[in-house]
Amino acid sequence: MMKILIIEDTPNKKTAIEEVIGALFKGTANHYGVTWAEDLNSAQRFLYTDQFDLVIFDMYLPDTKNIGLERDCSSELITVFSQSKNYNSEAIALTQFEISEVDNIQLFNKAGITLVNYDESNAWKTALELKLNRVAQKIKCDFLIFCALTKERAAFSDTEAVLGDTQNISGLDCQEIKIGDHYGFIVKPSEMGLVSMAIASSKAIELFQPKIVAMSGICAGVHGESNYLDIIVGKVCWEYQTGKWKDGEFKQEPMQASLDSNLKIDLEQSKDDIGLITQVRNNLFESELATMKIRIAPISSGSAVIADSTMMERIGSQHRKMAGLEMEMYSLYEAAAQSLCRPLYFGAKAVVDMGDSSKGDKFHDIGCLTSARYVSIMLKRQLEKLQ
């Protein structure tokens, strides 16, 4: 969701600014929230404590609302803006003075704040619309979910999340989703596998700048470490195909990606959360769900579909506690870990087969649903912490 801070205490001017913003985004998929600061103290507090996509400045404010007279606060505001986490945000100052009359115009220029005369003409509206359009093109969101299959994404329709329209955004197959008060997208790559997921997740994370990313779906289990319809959360994840062939023998060299330590604690605690497990199983009656467990365990990724018990044993030898095998999670973990915005990340997939010759699709639909429910619940909890 686009976040806008408006520093303004004049009622008529506030109304005019709101009308421009509302008219520009009416009927579009852009969600936005406005925070108002009507005095210097609250403006400084918001700039220091929160991050905004656009900051709209007024130069003259009282130090405290309803106490004292307005004064020129531009120097203080620019200093705080430049030192805060918003220093790189889009910014515009609307002043009723002629630009030529502003003494400290160089301060605005150095801080990257566009200074515009607020008058009866429409010039200031055009300038504000340009800023809003520039911010809208960045399309930031709170979270992203990645699903390799259409049925994995469709399963979110039976969760507490609210699904919206599908969109083609910069070549990405996206579907709008809202969890609680937070907006995001479910992104589906063009194909299954590590390569397509690496491309889609890297591109989406840099484009949308989310706070947290997740993956849901289905996977193969490992005998002795997981059972049908268990949900496997990737504690560590690696690609089992990396290594070197030498003298007819493949020597493995798996590179691991792991979870953030604080997030891992929350995920570990979820496996004993009876209320959460009840929500995941609600109105589902497969007998295997009676013994379903949430396992925070090692999971391996590879680009091939495995339906061979011998190959499963060979891959499983890379980690004695490996509980699952799937085709995309390692790509997401690495894309998130190496991105510029460094979001939190986790993946959760339900066991629907054991990667042997009996592989089938009996549990696909229910596996997609239980993993989607778990992911939506955990995302809601984490997003509330990240506000």
Curated annotation (Swiss-Prot):
UniProt GO molecular function: adenosylhomocysteine nucleosidase activity; methylthioadenosine nucleosidase activity
Notes concerning its domains: Has 2 domains, an N-terminal response regulatory domain and a C-terminal purine nucleoside phosphorylase (PNP) domain; the PNP domain has ATP nucleosidase activity. Expression of the C-terminal domain alone is highly toxic in E.coli.
Protein name: Detocs response regulatory ATP nucleosidase DtcC
Lineage, highest ranks first: Bacteria, Pseudomonadati, Pseudomonadota, Gammaproteobacteria, Vibrionales
Keyword Hydrolase: yes
EC number: 3.5.99.-
Domain of life: Bacteria
Species name: Vibrio alginolyticus
GO (cellular component) term, any one: cytosol
Encoding gene (name): dtcC
